[in-house]
Amino acid sequence: SSDTSIFIKESSSASTEPNELGVFAMTDRGLRGISNPSAIFLSEHRENVPGSVVMVTQEGTRPLLVEVQALVDGSHLPSPKRLSVGLDQQRLSMLIAVLHRHAGIGCYDQDVFVNAVGGVKITEPASDLAVMLAIAGSIGNRAMPAGLVVFGEAGLAGEIRPAPRGQERLKEAAKLGFSKAIIPRANAPKTPIEGLEVFAVDRLTDAIAAARDTA
């Protein structure tokens, strides 16, 4: 059979960078490394689905494209659910508060579920922008533009902060055929990246407007 099971582990080898991410598949011929894990994690990605955003994360030294999904639905509970799979639970509550305060998008009476597709565990704050745009898309029942990737950390004042290795993230997205990127202004490339239109933003409201205007 060609069916595979995906395993993700941090390398402990002295010959690799600290926290290097290794992605492996168990096949009928045994365990093998995957040279292009983004293709695996995006293999089931469907464009133009409300609540779905593709982000470029950087675990170790490898840029990795991952789909982040959000579902926001009316709650019948006194304290609505806030559930995150593959992303930081406490950070989700903070991002919901930032969305409400700085973009006027409230979900105080709604359950919020967020998932990093494919079993990936994302630990870096550069996932913030993807999570917030996914939540906003689910609430507004509005899909993100086709071919869009995002990354960026959110501050409590609604600012979008830069992520490390921004150029590597953008080049990986372009290599995989993505055509638009919403990123922190400080990560804007010095020279254009072929095939990739970059929207550099300072604030959450700018990012939401860019996603809407480029649809």
Residue locations for each model-derived region?
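Peripheral, non-AAA+ core regions of ATP-driven protein-machinery
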Residues: 1-215
